[in-house]
C-alpha cells in the first residue's frame, strides 16, 4: 500500500479563520491525506492567511515566504487571498508569484480543488475514520462554533465585508448537529463566533428550522436557548462572542441569569462598542448613543449581576478631538467594563476611513491608546478585587507540578485572564485538563486571579 500524501498547514488570524482551517483539515483527513507537522515532511503546504490590519498582512506574507523557502509548493487561502494590490492584481500573487494557487476565505471546496490538482488524493488509502466533530486545532475541551459568515455592516475602519461578503447564516439544524457532535467528543466549552453573532438569521428572515423534531427559529436568542439546553445535558458552557449591540441582545441576558440555562449560557458578552462619542461613532458608521449604551449596561447587570462585559475600542480615529477622547475615558469609568482592549487607529488598505479628514499623528494615536489602557486597567483591577474570597467554577486548561491554569466564566481563552490554581493537597481534589473545579480566590491583579481548590 502506497504512503498517504502529506499536507503541511499554517493557520493565521482570528477564531473565524481557525474554524476555516479546521474544516479544510477535516476534509483533507476524510480524503486520506495526512497532516504534516513540518515543512520538509510535507508534499505541499496550505497557508490560511489574515488580511485585516497591516501587521497581519505582513505576518501572512512572511509565512507564505517561509513556506515557499522551506517547502516550495504552497497553496494560499484566507482573507488576504481576496485582497488586491495597488496595481489591482492579486496581492499574494504579486508578492509571491511562485504560489500554486490562491483562494479567498471560507473556501474549502476551492482549496481542495487546488490540492487535488497538485497532489492527487490517494486512490486506495487506508483512511482513518474522521470523528463526527471534525478535526479541531483547539484543545480537546473547548471549540469554536461558527454560526454565520460575512457581515452586512459597512464600518468605515473595516474591510471584512469586502473579503468575506455579506451575512450568510448557517442552517440552525446544521449548527445544532455540529454543537452536539462537539459536546459528544468531550468539549466542555463552546465559543459561538461569527462576524456578527447578533445578526444571525437576518439574511433568511429568521426562517424556522427543525432540530430533533422541534422548531427553532434561525435567530440568535432562539439558537442560544437551544444551545443552552443542549449544553446543560453535557454539563458544558456556551460563550457568546462578536455580539453587535442590537436591541435583540437584551433578550439574551435573562437566559444567562435564570432557569435551566443558568451556568450553561455563560454570563459573558463580547460586544465591540468601538467608541463612546456620537460624532466619532457616526464617522465610524457605528450605533451612536453612548447614554443608551450605559442605560443598557446598567439594565443588563440588574438582570444578571454576574455578567462580564468584554469590548474593544479604537483610539485616535480620524478627526477625534481631545474632548471626544475624554468622553471615551469617562464612558469606560462609568460603564465599568470588565475586559477591554484598545487599538491605536491604523489605516487599513481599502477602508473608507482612509478618506476621512483629520488624520492624527502616530504619536498622538499611541499616546491616547496608552492613556485609555491605563484607565481600563484601573477599572478592571477594581472589579477583579471584588472576586477575592469568592469560590468560583474554573475550567482547567493546563496542569503541571506547580499547579493548574484555568478560566472562570468571565474568561475566554487567549484573550482574557486566567486563574492560577495551587496544586491539590489531597488526591480527592486532584484535577486534570478539561475538569471543572471549585476554586476559592485568594488573590487578584488587573488581569488574572490566584486561588486554591
Curated annotation (Swiss-Prot):
Binds 2 [4Fe-4S] clusters. One cluster is coordinated with 3 cysteines and an exchangeable S-adenosyl-L-methionine. One of its GO terms (biological process) is tRNA modification. Residues 5-120 form the MTTase N-terminal domain. InterPro entries: Elp3/MiaA/NifB-like_rSAM, Methylthiotransferase, Methylthiotransferase_CS, Methylthiotransferase_N, Methylthiotransferase_N_sf, NA-bd_OB-fold, Ribosomal_uS12_MeSTrfase_RimO, rSAM. It is an enzyme of class 2 (transferase). Keywords: 4Fe-4S, Cytoplasm, Iron, Iron-sulfur, Metal-binding, S-adenosyl-L-methionine, Transferase. [4Fe-4S] cluster 2 binds at residues 151, 155, 158. Residues 385-453 form the TRAM domain. Residues 137-382 form the Radical SAM core domain. The keyword Zinc does not apply. Its cofactor is [4Fe-4S] cluster. Catalyzes the methylthiolation of an aspartic acid residue of ribosomal protein uS12. Belongs to the methylthiotransferase family. RimO subfamily. This is Ribosomal protein uS12 methylthiotransferase RimO. It comes from Burkholderia cenocepacia (strain HI2424).
Amino acid at each position: 500500500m502506497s504512503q498517504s500524501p502529506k499536507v503541511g498547514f499554517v493557520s493565521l488570524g482570528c477564531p473565524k479563520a481557525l474554524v476555516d482551517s479546521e474544516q479544510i483539515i477535516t476534509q483533507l483527513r476524510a480524503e486520506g491525506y495526512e497532516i504534516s507537522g513540518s515543512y520538509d515532511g510535507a508534499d505541499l503546504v496550505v497557508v490560511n492567511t489574515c488580511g485585516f490590519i497591516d501587521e497581519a498582512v505582513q505576518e501572512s506574507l512572511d509565512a507564505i515566504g517561509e513556506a515557499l523557502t522551506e517547502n516550495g509548493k504552497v497553496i494560499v487561502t484566507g482573507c488576504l487571498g481576496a485582497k488586491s494590490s495597488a496595481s489591482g492584481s492579486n496581492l499574494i500573487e504579486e508578492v509571491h508569484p511562485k504560489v500554486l494557487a490562491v483562494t479567498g476565505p471560507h473556501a474549502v471546496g476551492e482549496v481542495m480543488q487546488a490540492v487535488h490538482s497538485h497532489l492527487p488524493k490517494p486512490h486506495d488509502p487506508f483512511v482513518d475514520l474522521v470523528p463526527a466533530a471534525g478535526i479541531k486545532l483547539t484543545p480537546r475541551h473547548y471549540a469554536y462554533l461558527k454560526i454565520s459568515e460575512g457581515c452586512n455592516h459597512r464600518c468605515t475602519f473595516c474591510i471584512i465585508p469586502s473579503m468575506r461578503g455579506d451575512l450568510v447564516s448557517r442552517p440552525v439544524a446544521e449548527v445544532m448537529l455540529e454543537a452536539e457532535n462537539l459536546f459528544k467528543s468531550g468539549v466542555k466549552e463552546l465559543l459561538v463566533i461569527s462576524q456578527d453573532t447578533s445578526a444571525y438569521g437576518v439574511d433568511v428572515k429568521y426562517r424556522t428550522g427543525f432540530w430533533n423534531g422541534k422548531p427553532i427559529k434561525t435567530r440568535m436568542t432562539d439558537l442560544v436557548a437551544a444551545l443552552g439546553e443542549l449544553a446543560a445535558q453535557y454539563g458544558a458552557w456556551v460563550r457568546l462572542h462578536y455580539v453587535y449591540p442590537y436591541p435583540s441582545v437584551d433578550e439574551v441576558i435573562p437566559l444567562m441569569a435564570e432557569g435551566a440555562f443558568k451556568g450553561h449560557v455563560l454570563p459573558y458578552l463580547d460586544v465591540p462598542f468601538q467608541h463612546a462619542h456620537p460624532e466619532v461613532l457616526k464617522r465610524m458608521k457605528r450605533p451612536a448613543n453612548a447614554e443608551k449604551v450605559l442605560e443598557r449596561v446598567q439594565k443588563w447587570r440588574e438582570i444578571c449581576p454576574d455578567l462580564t462585559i468584554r469590548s474593544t475600542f479604537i483610539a485616535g480615529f480620524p478627526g477625534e478631538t481631545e474632548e471626544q477622547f475624554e468622553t471615551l475615558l469617562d464612558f469606560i469609568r462609568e460603564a465599568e467594563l470588565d475586559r477591554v482592549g484598545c487599538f491605536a487607529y491604523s489605516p487599513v488598505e481599502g477602508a473608507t476611513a482612509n478618506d476621512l479628514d483629520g488624520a492624527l499623528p502616530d504619536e498622538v494615536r499611541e499616546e491616547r491608546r496608552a492613556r485609555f489602557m491605563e484607565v481600563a486597567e484601573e477599572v478592571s483591577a477594581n472589579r477583579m478585587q471584588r472576586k477575592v474570597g469568592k469560590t468560583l467554577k474554573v475550567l482547567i486548561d493546563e496542569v503541571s507540578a506547580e499547579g493548574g491554569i484555568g478560566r472562570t466564566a468571565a474568561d475566554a481563552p487567549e484573550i482574557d485572564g486566567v486563574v492560577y490554581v495551587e496544586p491539590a493537597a489531597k488526591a480527592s481534589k486532584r484535577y486534570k485538563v478539561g475538569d471543572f473545579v471549585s476554586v476559592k480566590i485568594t488573590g487578584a491583579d488587573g488581569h488574572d486571579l490566584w486561588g486554591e481548590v
